[in-house]
């Protein structure tokens, strides 16, 4: 890792969360569809990742198994990280979909985790109340969390939607918190929305907010701002193959085959101003009432923000950021050398930061687009080498403190098998 190639931002402060499992073929720490692997709340920062908790010098890969969910916290701005290792759950599947997701409910201070899914039974755990609200007095041990559950509190068990889960996602919803999942397979699935109510500590099934019809939505992001929950997504059309309707079929898990990203099309947008129950298009027209059993379907009017045909290199689950004005803009930033996905984030002053990886030279670069210039120009303000994976960002800290915290994987200059999960802090 080298931090001094291009330097218009100050040198970042780099802290280590833990060892990355370099022996795995797939990257598990740092994927674009992790909505929040790093979050700030009430002056503390939290991060989640997988690690084997063993030495990177071990020659036998079997000694580095299994992996464990790890959760770190620190008091901002610069206290030491404190770590919980959830060693009661063994992660053994080498599949890049099976990441860790985290959410914090503002109203009751609970922390929620969901992990290790690619069309699998739900895996979920949560903390006791108040652990994030009063971190100074809350002990940081695994026994303040539940064991791994296959349901969420408040939803009758067994629940038909929790048997085929991918892409869990948590996010703030005012005083409450939302939880969304995909139910189905690549090209053939729906997105479902649950609401965790702080007042009761229970979840409510709000409904199927995105319904696929011979396709499935891939969500770029879900962001809550000024009473509105914003969502963007692409669709992926489904291509039938032998055995697609077999309940035991696993071909769709192999990250190859006919239902890949070549079938992605269109960038779509909708929002809800009543906490996820009623959805409107960009023209403020109601298109789905979840309380009445409705869903946003591909044929709903006014969904398409940008019309992009199949086969144009449109990648699923890219990035989304909602600025204070909530206006669409479109500007080219030049070609990118690979399909690795980046991140978008808005600063305290409304400027846009683009964090872009380049695996062709193991670099990470940061571009800045000024709000004052209507985001028309993107200027590179930092570049470093020795990074891999897809960067993640603590969006809340940037917007509230003008500190850009980037979650990334740093690769040793001497050995590609020596990788660390790190946080880079830039004072912008």
Model-derived regions: residue spans:
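Extracellular, repeat-based ectodomains that mediate carbohydrate processing or recognition
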Residues: 1-428
């Amino acid at each position: 890792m080298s931090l001094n190639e291009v330097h218009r931002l100050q040198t970042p402060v780099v802290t280590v969360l833990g060892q990355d499992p370099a022996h795995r073929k797939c990257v598990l720490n740092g994927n674009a569809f992790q909505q929040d692997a790093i979050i700030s709340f009430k002056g503390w920062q939290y991060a989640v990742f997988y690690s084997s908790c063993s030495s990177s010098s071990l020659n036998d890969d079997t000694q580095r198994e299994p992996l464990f969910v790890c959760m770190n916290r620190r008091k901002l701005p610069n206290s030491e990280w404190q770590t919980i290792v959830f060693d009661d759950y063994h992660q053994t599947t080498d599949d890049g979909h099976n990441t860790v997701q985290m959410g914090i409910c503002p109203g009751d201070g609970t922390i929620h985790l969901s992990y290790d899914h690619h069309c699998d039974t739900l895996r979920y755990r949560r903390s006791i109340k108040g652990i994030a609200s009063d971190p100074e007095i809350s002990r940081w041990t695994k026994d303040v969390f539940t064991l791994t559950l296959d349901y969420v509190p408040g939803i009758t068990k067994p629940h038909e939607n929790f048997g085929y889960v991918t892409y869990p996602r948590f996010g703030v919803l005012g005083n409450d918190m939302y939880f969304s999942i995909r139910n189905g397979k690549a090209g053939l699935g729906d997105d479902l929305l649950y609401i965790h109510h702080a007042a009761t500590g229970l979840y409510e099934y709000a409904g199927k907010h995105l319904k696929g019809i011979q396709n499935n939505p891939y969500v770029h992001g879900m962001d809550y701002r000024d009473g509105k929950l914003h969502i963007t997504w692409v669709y992926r059309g489904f291509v039938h193959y032998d055995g697609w309707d077999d309940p035991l079929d696993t071909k769709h898990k192999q990250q190859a085959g006919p239902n890949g990203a070549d079938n992605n099309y269109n960038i779509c947008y909708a929002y809800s101003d009543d906490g996820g129950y009623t959805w409107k298009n960009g023209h403020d027209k109601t298109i789905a009432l979840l309380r009445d059993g409705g869903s946003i379907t591909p044929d709903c009017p006014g969904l398409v923000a940008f019309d992009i045909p199949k086969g144009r290199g449109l990648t699923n689950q890219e990035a989304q950021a909602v600025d204070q004005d909530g206006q669409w803009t479109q500007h080219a930033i030049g070609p990118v050398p690979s399909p690795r996905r980046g991140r978008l984030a808005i600063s305290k002053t409304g400027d846009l930061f683009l964090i872009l990886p380049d695996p062709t030279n193991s670099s990470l670069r940061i571009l800045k687009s000024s709000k004052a210039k209507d985001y028309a120009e993107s200027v590179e303000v930092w570049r470093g080498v020795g990074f891999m994976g897809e960067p993640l960002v603590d969006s809340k800290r940037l917007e509230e403190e003008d500190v850009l915290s980037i979650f990334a994987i740093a690769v040793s200059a001497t050995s590609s098998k020596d990788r660390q999960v790190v946080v880079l802090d830039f004072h912008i």
